[in-house]
């Protein structure tokens, strides 16, 4: 998501900041800014749009100083405008800060701060921290940051500078932050590429770390002020490898980014006490009688998951269409139909054409989109952004889980708005949704087990994926991932359909991946597993942690944490992504750019 750079040393800070931000452009952004400590005080320049606009503005008013912070922003709270760009400052302009992540409780903090006389100049969640720092600062910048962070809730990487201090202070929780160690200078960045021209000796900060950087050294403590030690490492990555975060492929990096992507998708939107979500939509849920989901590929499976949730939680009739077929079937549409278009890129031509057909017939429109400024964002009435950040790997991973989370948010929003979802059940769902980032982190720890399963089955010529209810789309997505990057033939079916044809394929050579997490249809899924075993099939089960029945039936079991059955696909798809990845690597495939595929399909 956002790019962060900080510098204290002997060089021209402006040059270091702009160079570092350029090296983080691959993360995506819609505005940029820097703050430099000059002899005249702290000076801030920020612009919406590309870095070139910022560089041009800085060129007109050069900032001379050897300490500064810089930021590229991917908008979450507030439009991509100059006032909403970072850095943000205290009202007296003496403290500047940059922030990656989301402060979930910013609205209540903002109301309290305004009641105490603070005046806000932006629409961002970040600015609340600037005002909190104004209250907590009493001469020690690091202590002021620690005290201010006690009030906020959410994911963050924060970097702060003060015009009276020859130091930068920073803190992180969930959002990444790395320290670069130099001689007579030190650096901060959200990712290693920004540091490579200056140093290869780095410290990776951990959750809860708070750091003070001066020219002479680095001091790290926890949020309570207790000293902590972080081991310095030498990175030998090329720039390309650094952009991959040290992972061998973008796809694997993006799989591992899913916990903080979910933080971004959900952050600031959950209102557990009220049992609702804040989506900022102009749409009135009571004016919609039916939904038409229009999407392609991975996005279409997220849409199918959305269909299950919209009908279950909101009692809202929902049709699901592959976008390339939608406009050719002459769909029945009226003014109370909502066309729900889902696309990572916002440029998928079949989705755009399907949306245009629905609008031509009078439908309302809502886009679930990752890429801001895309064609789809301009053609829909309302947008629900998934905030997944740039996805480089052709095979979608983090955008898919973000889309699933967005579908869950939308279903709760419709359910509460239409009076179909009880307060207690909504609160339960929202509490479970808040756990999702941590649960996905737990699943990622299972990678060695998934790699072992991949080793056993990577020579198979065919795979079958089975799932029921909300896990049927998970099966479809698992099969698609395997096909896309390993080139192994894979099919997916609702598990109850197996006996209506696919069962003829089952023999001792066919691995069958079964989504068998706990839920209302668990026992029926066990029966399907027994049917596979009776015909010699090899079962790879995705099961709920603690399930003692599954190991008696399946050759291989990959456990995922227990979660609300309607949210199980968000944790269950992760081992399927890893399985596809590990098999493709074993087969020597080009994981990030598989043959014949494009990231964004812009031709019919």
Curated annotation (Swiss-Prot):
One family name in Pfam for this protein: GATase_6
Keyword Cell division: no
Domain Glutamine amidotransferase type-2: residue ranges: 2-216
Keywords: Aminotransferase, Cytoplasm, Glutamine amidotransferase, Repeat, Transferase
Catalytic site: 2 (nucleophile), 599 (for fru-6p isomerization activity)
Catalyzed reactions per annotation: D-fructose 6-phosphate + L-glutamine = D-glucosamine 6-phosphate + L-glutamate
Subcellular location per the Swiss-Prot or TrEMBL entry: Cytoplasm
Record GO cellular component, one term: cytosol
Keyword Endoplasmic reticulum in annotation: no
Gene3D superfamilies recorded: Glucose-6-phosphate isomerase like protein, domain 1, Glutamine Phosphoribosylpyrophosphate, subunit 1, domain 1
Any one GO molecular function term: carbohydrate derivative binding
Gene Ontology terms describing biological process: carbohydrate metabolic process; fructose 6-phosphate metabolic process; protein N-linked glycosylation; UDP-N-acetylglucosamine metabolic process
Coiled-coil portions: none
Group of enzyme by EC: transferase
InterPro entries given in the database record: GATase_2_dom, GFAT, GFAT_N, GlmS/AgaS_SIS, GlmS/FrlB_SIS, Ntn_hydrolases_N, SIS_dom, SIS_dom_sf
Residue intervals of the SIS domain: 281-420, 453-594
The EC number(s) this enzyme carries: 2.6.1.16
Recorded superkingdom: Bacteria
Self-association and partners: Homodimer.
Cross-referenced PANTHER family: GLUCOSAMINE--FRUCTOSE-6-PHOSPHATE AMINOTRANSFERASE, ISOMERIZING, GLUTAMINE--FRUCTOSE-6-PHOSPHATE TRANSAMINASE (ISOMERIZING)
General function of this protein: Catalyzes the first step in hexosamine metabolism, converting fructose-6P into glucosamine-6P using glutamine as a nitrogen source.
Name this polypeptide is given: Glutamine--fructose-6-phosphate aminotransferase [isomerizing]
Organism: Thermus thermophilus (strain ATCC 27634 / DSM 579 / HB8)
Gene field: glmS
